Amino acid sequence: MACGATLKRSMEFEALMSPQSPKRRRCAPLPGSPATPSPQRCGIRPEIQQGQQQPLGGDLRLTPEQILQNIKQEYTRYQRRRQLEGAFNQGEAGVSNEVQASCSSLTAPSSPGSLVKKDQPTFSLRQVGILCERLLKDHEDKIREEYEQILNIKLAEQYESFVKFTHDQIMRRYGARPTSYVS
């Protein structure tokens, strides 16, 4: 019968995993990932056609329009968050939204307050930092998922070739003889 055994490598092979090593390390799972294994992490081949796969980083270039759209979406999320925080704080302070609406409707468009708003930048430096962090995090998550998917596909292919090789070795050694429990 075919039997495989492995030995643990000694510490002298630790140099393979040094930063100068040409070998790649597997990406660590994300800190917020679920504890239950997903189909991708279990080595189950995802249902993706081979023709649909694109090389890593193939369509990851963002056009200026996409960047602008992403920044606008992130800014609206940021504004909603600020509005919710403001509404919560106003509710605690006892200030009603109706009073604020009536005060804001009294200001004329030609008043000096509206001119100051036109001169101010659309985003503060802090807001731009938050927007960029969020966009980078989303982009990094997409890259991680794609990388993990590619690794799982390669692992599944390697496993299939191992099973085929083992089967071929068994058939070559024992041929068409019936298997028995006595060797």
UniProtKB/Swiss-Prot annotation:
A motif (SYVS motif) lies at residues 180-183. InterPro entries: Akirin. The keyword Nucleus applies. It is found in: Nucleus. Disulfide bonds: none annotated. One of its GO terms (biological process) is negative regulation of skeletal muscle satellite cell proliferation. GO terms for molecular function: transcription coregulator activity. Keywords: Nucleus. Residues 14-43 are annotated as: Disordered. GO terms for cellular component: chromatin; nucleus. Belongs to the akirin family. Molecular adapter that acts as a bridge between proteins, and which is involved skeletal muscle development. Functions as a signal transducer for MSTN during skeletal muscle regeneration and myogenesis. This is Akirin-1B. It comes from Xenopus laevis.
